[in-house]
Amino acid sequence: MSRRPAVSALCLLLIIAACTSQEGSSSTAAGETTVAATTPLVTDVAELPGRLVVIDDGGNIVTMDPDGSDPAPITEDAGDSAGYRQPTFSPVADTLAWSQITADGTALGSSDGRGGSRMAIPMNAPPFYMYWSPDGNGIGVLHNSAQGTIEFEIVDFAAQSTQVMGSGSPFYFSWSPDSSQVAAHVQFDVFATIDLEGNRSDLGATAEGYQAPHWAPEGIFHLGEDGLELRQEGGEARVLATTPGPVAFVVNRQGTRVAVQSIVAGDQPPGINAAITQTPALPGNAVVVVDVESGQVYEVVDSPSFGLFWSPDGTSLLVLQPIQDGSGEISAMVWRNGEVSEVSTLSPHPAFVEEVLRFFDQYGQSLQLWSPDSSGFALAGAIDDEPGIWVHTIAGGDPVKVAEGSWVSWSNT
């Protein structure tokens, strides 16, 4: 990632394409086989599981139930002398981590879900991105260095220690499922693994036209020289689809589906093309889902998105679609079982746009917007000019404002 004030080239192309593309469509590829979810969807916000962590309108961190009840303050001193950013829950425990700047300096802060067991691990610079390892024992951190580049540092919670593992700008990474190493895409052309001792192994050629790789149980997904590629265990590479331009993609946790959009300037022919090699050619300026096992491609919407986020069960995709009326609003849509439905429209909070949506392919791996049971999701923004934290259920019902605030993330359990 890169924290330069300019919008990334991919996002700039997305904005251009969005202004010239047609409105979204819920059409899907012919012959699609849908898989029905086995868990009934919750329709009442009060019945949703897990906890939310919010940065409230005073800048403090608070956890609460999904309906806003049972709030637990984590910090209470935000202001001129203390600032807190991007709190998230561990994937395996009731533990929080966040970036902080206080009178004691910059640090990675941590506590349990109710503010107990507080600790602060000093850092040389404030983290602007944090990504828990799947086992919850560590966090990969990105922050700026004194040399003007980005440093990648791993925090070991048990030892309360940190170690710089790499540097470069931009810097994107993805944890291996066993938490033993990361796959990194650095300075556009470096593609390598980095283990917990800092040892680097080159993964070979990679393309420039993407940001974050994604390591899933199936292997490492990245943009190769021939298209969207899955590098499997043992080094074998499989091209899933060819792409007409730069891409952003997110893979579900199971590694079975990839949501992809390829951004190109100018008009592109609609639809999905099949190459002679039977490798599908993805359309430009559209969002599609690729089934990893079968290679089938399903069209989600026929215009670019500002953000894509998979549900924990891997069956539903949250699509944040720009509304082309000059209002700055987005449509929160859900693709599920081959169908797209609009859940709400809202104006996303500026912090969410600047910090998350610019890099949604990276945050899609670390930020939990969905409830643990995949029945709902939470967003920070304004609905009908009412700002706050809004919880949505995908089975129906109006979104519910549960708190004031600028940031929200859901626990994993």
Q: What residues fall within each predicted segment?
A:
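Sequence signature of WD/YWTD-type beta-propeller architectures
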Residues: C19-T413
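Sec-dependent bacterial lipoprotein signal peptides
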Residues: M1-A17
